[in-house]
Amino acid sequence: MPSTWQPIFAGQEAARATAAIDAIAGALAEWPSFPEDDPFGASLATGEAGLALFFSYLDRARPGARYADLAAERLERAIDRVAASFHRPGLYQGFVSIAWTVEHLRDRQDEDDPNEEIDRALFELLARTPWYDGHDLTSGLAGLGAYALERWPGATASACLARVCQRLEELAVPQEVGLAWPTAEWNLYPEERQRFPHGMINLGVAHGVPGVLPVLAQAAAVGAAPESARALLRGAVAWLLSRKLPAGGES
């Protein structure tokens, strides 16, 4: 199928954007290795895995400019440090962040599967109930589901997706309209905890209900979710739509 993608910018705007990309790429190419004692130094959000992803996509846009080598170097450093991240699973800064990056960038034709152990560990972790590590995309269930979707249709990945949906169902709280996933007070930053001492329901993608919806929807679409996940999705969408501000309203 031919691509329908079109550049966002043209002319002078495109030239300015290209110059900005060049400046960013140049700075990141000289970025030193993250310190060994940095707990997030291997991660997708703030570490080696994120730089590997950046340089890999830059190589696709500009092949032959040594970005592939930079991506490989950064990814190797991230993999070497995955054990240090094993005490936290999250998609942004835990061991799943490194595993997702490896899966996203690797050659699927390669018979060696570097993430089998990660899948097994995640499957065991997701058996835990009640679940205390939150629902969100950055460090909770939605992020683990995003990793499992990247690994789909692997058998263990499908089983992980089913467990993600089960844990989300257990955490869902009925609302006046639909249902939602509150963020407990112990999962809030200190300044947020002062404002919301009993927790809150977040409307952002990273930490809130919107980040859960595409994971549930895609899990249902690929047939990896229990039937109850569809009702869960409908309830969450209904709640989210009920939060829409009136015309001219301020958030």
Language-model-derived ranges and their functions:
Residues 1-251:
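Glycan-recognition and catalytic cores of secretory/periplasmic carbohydrate-active enzymes
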